Design a protein with these regions (language model features):
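Conserved nucleotide-binding/hydrolysis micro-motifs of P-loop NTPases
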Residues: 26-28, 73-75, 119-124, 175-178
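A glycine- and Lys/Arg-enriched "phosphate-lid" helix/loop adjacent to the NTP-binding pocket
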Residues: 79-152
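NTP-dependent small-molecule kinase module
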Residues: 125-207
Length: 207
């Protein structure tokens, strides 16, 4: 979920545990995102573009054990379901999307650890307003609330529908002081390190 703290955690894991961050690649040569903001009929081609781009990025990252991702292809379906429920996808388009999604993800390598970041909605909206990105502000509170609600069953979806052996770690980040509280940061890093015992936790001044 946007503004939940994903990038903060990814950067923390990179700096303190030595992971390489796979930057989110955004390919939009046809300006589909901008077209979608002006006319929702572009939702389907836009989301297909995101799905294929994120899938290619995930394949690249999964070739090595050192990469971490801010956002993975697994969560792409959350947006597609939201747009379908909002009437932006036709039934046939949603069916086509699901067929492609299932086909692409059927044989991908499961991540070694999936960190699920939780954050209260009011705190997410406070962060969106605070960082002042106009494109995020312009879509309005109703959109963010719909997306937030769509993300709530996401963990159950991954566990039940994908039928994959994925280890989940849930992290509550509603507290804006988390990253500034050494005891909380250390506890989190130690928990993650249990899944990667070969990694050493670096002190902040060495990161």
């Amino acid at each position: 979920m946007t503004a939940s703290g994903k990038s903060t955690i990814v950067n923390l894991l990179s700096q303190r545990l030595g992971f390489d961050v796979m930057p989110e690649e955004f390919r939009d040569p046809l300006d589909l995102l901008s077209r979608f903001h002006h006319d929702h009929k572009w939702a389907f081609p836009m989301q297909l573009n995101f799905l294929v781009t994120r899938f290619a990025q995930y394949l690249c990252a999964s070739e090595k054990d050192n990469y971490i991702l801010d956002r993975s292809v697994f969560g792409d379906k959350v947006y597609a379901m939201l747009y379908y429920r909002s009437g932006y996808f036709k039934d046939s388009q949603f069916g086509c999307y699901l067929t492609l999604y299932d086909s692409l993800l059927r044989n991908v390598k499961a991540p070694k650890l999936f960190v699920v970041v939780r954050c209260e909605f009011d705190e997410i909206m406070r962060r969106i307003q605070s960082r002042g990105r106009q494109d995020e502000i312009d879509v309005g509170v109703d959109y963010w609330k719909s997306l937030y609600d769509a993300y709530m069953p996401f963990l159950d979806f991954l566990q039940n529908e994908l039928q994959r052996d994925i280890t989940f770690y849930e992290l509550e980040l509603s507290d804006p002081t988390f990253i500034e509280t050494p005891s909380k940061v250390t506890a989190f890093l130690e928990d993650v390190q249990k899944f990667f015992p070969e990694r050493k936790i670096l002190p902040p001044h060495e990161s």
